[in-house]
Amino acid sequence: MKPFPRAEISAQALKNNLSRLRQIAPNSSVMAVVKANGYGHGLLNVASCLTEADGFGLARLEEALALRAGGVKAKLVLLEGFFRQVDLTTLVEHGIDTVIHNEVQLDMLENASLSKPVTVWLKLDSGMHRLGFTPEQFAQVYARLEACPQVAKPINIMSHFACADEPDNPMTQEQLQVFEALTKNSKGYRTLANSAGTLYWPDSQADWIRPGIALYGVSPVIGDLGRNHGLEPAMKLVSQLIAVREHKAGQPVGYGCFWHAKADTRLGVVAIGYGDGYPRNAPEGTPVWVNGRRVPVVGRVSMDMLTVDLGIDAKDSIGDDVVLWGKELPVEEVAEHIGTIAYELVTKLTPRVAVCLD
């Protein structure tokens, strides 16, 4: 018997999405971003499906070590870098690359005693103003890294887009110009394109692309769908009906009793709630998929359950599957109804949701 709720992860979709991104950026290596537990799809699940990726991008050292322990031998890059000097020894021991984005990291690196040099990616702040060295600092920091015996040569360079998911925003072109001007003569690898850069800004693809959400079949752009780019949803979030109830016109349902039926209907109670990561703020009308059709959420989402209006003529039964998002119902659309982004939905599932590789 399959558990519920569960997130069914399609290995074939992950592989197909990687292949599709290679078609879109044929001259670039692929750094598959698998931070946040593989965007909620399971870190080792995703890595086991993306063995053809050239490397993996992660946010935490613990994530990188989990991949090494799981037998992953590909290039691993810590996108936020290291936080303690002692971590440098671990990076060298396990062959993990690190981003350098601030003066403290640079000082720790220069004062470290390492058995061999560590591979670094110098982070340029090309306009996002979150991490990285400014264009004015860039040449001096680059020279310090060149002179540092603890740093493997050549030095790689990275930056990150602020607005690439807004295709008409001129900021992306400005960042691209800054990046090109400062890095065009560099000897190491260069990487700038995230998912949105890869899909919408081909001039940004450089030596490496860093797709995250696109690998999972989701578009990074509000109002767009991954399938418009030949991508397939990798996650299907499924639960079941645990009750089907006759409901009279005027009767409320759920905490607060703020929703009342306008006519006689049948309500279905679904075994999923905010305790599983489904948003409590999902408004009336948020769609779910039951037996080949969309039906709306009604009433307030509770910790373990939500309620849907199946309609007066519904033939649905207890035990029937309910798809919260997946191929039938794109997560991008669900996110738009709720007023959030698909990234948040897929990464906020709690451990109560069984993640099953298909």
Swiss-Prot record:
EC class name: isomerase
Source taxon at top rank: Bacteria
Enzyme Commission code(s) on record: 5.1.1.1
Residues annotated with N6-(pyridoxal phosphate)lysine modification: K35
Annotated keywords: Isomerase, Pyridoxal phosphate
Role noted for this protein: Catalyzes the interconversion of L-alanine and D-alanine. May also act on other amino acids.
Family: Belongs to the alanine racemase family.
Name of the protein in its database record: Alanine racemase
Organism classification: Bacteria, Pseudomonadati, Pseudomonadota, Gammaproteobacteria, Alteromonadales
